[in-house]
From Swiss-Prot:
The N-terminus (residues 1-111) is essential for DNA destabilization, it contributes strongly to ss- and dsDNA binding, but does not contribute to ATPase activity. This is DNA 3'-5' helicase/translocase StoXPB1. Residues 1-111 are annotated as: N-terminus. It comes from Sulfurisphaera tokodaii (strain DSM 16993 / JCM 10545 / NBRC 100140 / 7) (Sulfolobus tokodaii). PROSITE patterns: HELICASE_ATP_BIND_1, HELICASE_CTER.
Length: 543
């Protein structure tokens, strides 16, 4: 865009001439002197500011009218780049040429250029990265003017040596994932980090129960007032210097939450890479990020996305390391193998044959994707597959083996895990055990946990609701009647037993059906290390 034409009769040395060419074009000489025209696009490309143009012209005795100044200010504003948030996206409005600075972001598909609006569009996650890059290159930035509150609270607890190491490692980096076994005090680490950052914090939990546990732990381990903590959930949506929400609520309301926090804490962070939930991290601007998980490695490989969004895996300890130091109870893993009955074997074999025929050699992961696309063959194959799993999980001899284990462990505190509510109810009724499923209301659940905690012996039956998010009292025996095959679930269940107690050795029994995919998965778990190589046998192993 060409604007004001100007003349100068002064002799121009090379340096001055080159400066003029950074924001104007030389049109030639005539009787009035050297003629130039101001070129806005050239000025932008060379990152020349309006003040610089006026200074150079002033040295040559050239004054611009108020009209010219207003027109130039419109196209060459005070800032080189402006940021704004719009519809959950970060808008980058350049007034100078910046592609040379951010080309790598554009090449990777992180930045999109809107030709009509002449702006770059990306996720708010990249705000600080791009802002810092532009400032390092000398550009003047109009930032988002974020409303981040100060947080003046102090830590009242005591950290174990590995917790101190984890906190120090995180503080050196300002972001990252900390992986520690269940029962190792990840929440306390998060609270200590909140008191060190001393800025407004958003905590995202997987369940409502975890949300309440975080609130209670913050009140216990800091001098924070209850008014410092806001729960953002259901009808109660209070934003405070410390705001606690759930994955589902954060996903739905992230545009409201995005720019208000300096620190983002993601609990049970292995859930974050799910297609919907990763939007929480992508749309949140927080410059400091902490992920907490007992099992950060995902079976689908998406943990790499988790590490990218949260700052990489920066600290971890295995259960074995903490057991050696006495922080967790030692444990035994005991696999009990049972046979299918003749009737179950026949039905399983028939279904397996049907599955292989309908699946056409495709892996289960491929079938699941095809189901999402509405493929009828894949839908039929997965129906058969689920029937096969049900035969294995509900095998008659599993309940006989369960009976033997319960008799053997009589007098201990036992947790029984199953995938099926009907099976859980049947087991609880048979052994006069306590029962918690997804159908158990909050008050009843709290009552059961409170009672079970006081018992020296007893049985508590749990469905998958017990895998994460429940503060389950100490027990020393666990029995997996049915599971998903996931190592993550296996580790979560083992973790329920590892809280230390005098002379306690935790035992986790797994009842496995011979001659099925369940047996293959169980054999792979024998070599479990609990470190970063916690990859489960995937769904591919089931057929």
């Amino acid at each position: 865009m060409l604007l004001k034409t100007f003349y100068t009769q002064q002799w121009l040395d090379d340096e001055t001439f080159k400066k003029l060419l950074t924001f104007s074009r030389f049109l030639g000489r005539d009787k009035n002197g050297s003629q130039f025209v101001i070129d806005i696009e050239r000025a932008r490309r060379n990152k020349v500011k309006l003040d610089d143009i006026l200074s150079i012209l002033s040295e040559l005795g050239i004054e611009l009218s108020e009209t010219d100044l207003r027109e130039m200010a419109k196209y060459l504003p005070e800032y080189d780049v402006e940021f704004e948030l719009k519809d959950g996206k970060l808008i980058i409005k350049p007034h100078v040429f910046i592609l040379d600075i951010i080309k790598d972001y554009k090449d990777k598909g992180i930045l999109k250029y809107d030709k009509q609006s002449k702006v770059y569009v990306t996720d708010p996650y990249y705000y600080y990265q791009i802002k810092n890059r532009l400032e390092e290159n000398g550009l003047k930035i109009k930032d988002l003017g974020l409303d981040v509150k100060e947080l003046n609270i102090n830590f009242k607890g005591e950290l174990r040596d590995y917790q101190k190491e984890a906190v120090d490692t995180w503080l050196q980096r300002g972001s990252g994932v900390i992986a520690l076994p269940t029962g190792a005090g990840k929440t306390v680490i998060g609270i200590k980090i909140i008191t060190e950052v001393r800025k407004s914090t958003l905590i995202v939990t997987f369940t409502k129960d975890q949300m309440l546990q975080w609130r209670d732990a913050i009140l216990k381990f800091t001098d924070a007032n209850r008014s410092d903590i806001g729960l953002y959930y259901s009808e109660e949506k209070n934003i405070r210097p410390i705001t606690i929400t759930t994955y589902h609520t954060a996903y739905r309301h992230i545009d409201e939450l995005s720019g208000k926090f300096e620190l983002l804490i993601i609990d049970e962070a292995h859930h974050l890479p799910a297609d919907r939930f990763k939007e929480i991290a992508l749309k949140c601007i927080a410059s400091k990020r902490l992920g907490l998980s007992a099992t950060p490695v995902r079976e689908d490989g998406k943990h790499e996305e988790l590490f990218k969004l949260m700052g990489g895996l920066i600290y971890f300890k295995t259960p074995q390391e903490l057991i050696q130091k006495g922080y967790l109870a030692p444990f035994e893993l005991i696999q009990i193998r049972v046979n299918l009955t003749s009737k179950e074997k026949l039905k399983y074999a028939t279904l397996l044959s049907q599955f292989r025929k309908v699946a056409g050699g495709k892996k289960v992961s491929e079938l699941i994707q095809l189901v999402k696309e509405g493929n009828s063959n894949a839908i039929e194959a997965m129906k058969i597959y689920n029937e096969m799993k049900k035969i294995v999980n509900l095998a008659e001899n599993k309940l006989k083996a369960l009976d033997d284990i319960i008799q053997k462990e009589n007098g201990n505190k036992i947790l029984i895990f199953t995938q099926y509510v009907d099976q859980a109810e049947e087991i609880a009724k048979k052994y006069n055990a306590y029962l918690i499923t997804g159908k158990t209301n909050k008050n009843e659940r709290e009552k059961i946990l409170r009672i079970f905690k006081t018992l020296k012996s007893g049985i508590l039956v749990l469905t998958t609701v017990g895998d994460e998010g429940l503060d389950i009292p100490d027990a020393n025996v666990g029995i997996i009647v049915t599971g998903t095959g996931s190592r993550r679930q296996f580790i979560q269940r083992l973790g329920r037993l590892l809280r230390p107690s005098n002379g306690k050795v935790a035992r986790l029994y797994e009842i496995v059906t011979r001659g099925t995919a369940e047996e293959y998965q169980a054999s792979k778990r024998k070599d479990i290390t609990f470190g970063l190589d916690i990859y489960s046998s995937s769904e591919e192993d089931l057929v």
